[in-house]
């Protein structure tokens, strides 16, 4: 599922380069989704992406919001 999701995000990113950019955050929501799924896997990455998209609304200030770094196991 992870590879399918990453492929679909790549397809979306290719198509979206021809559309005006509207994301309020850096990195963009699609880049965030790709990084989150690549780092945490399909399920946790999708949950992080969902939370990010919920925050991306018209009256949100936006700004720099990277994917959280994984916690190191001791």
Curated annotation (Swiss-Prot):
UniProt entry keywords in alphabetical sequence: Cell inner membrane, Cell membrane, Membrane
The species this protein was found in: Endomicrobium trichonymphae
Membrane disposition: Peripheral membrane protein
Subcellular location(s) per record: Cell inner membrane
Protein name per Swiss-Prot or TrEMBL: Putative membrane protein insertion efficiency factor
Pfam short name (any one): YidD
Keyword Chaperone in annotation: no
Family according to the record: Belongs to the UPF0161 family.
NCBIfam families: membrane protein insertion efficiency factor YidD (TIGR00278)
The UniProt record lists the keyword Cell membrane: yes
């Amino acid at each position: 599922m992870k590879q399918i999701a990453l492929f679909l995000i790549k397809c979306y990113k290719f198509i979206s380069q021809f559309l005006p950019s509207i994301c309020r955050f850096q990195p963009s929501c699609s880049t965030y989704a790709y990084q989150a799924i690549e780092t945490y896997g399909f399920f946790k990455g999708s949950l992080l992406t969902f939370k990010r998209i919920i925050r991306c609304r018209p009256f949100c200030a936006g700004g720099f919001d990277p994917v959280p770094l994984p916690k190191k196991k001791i």
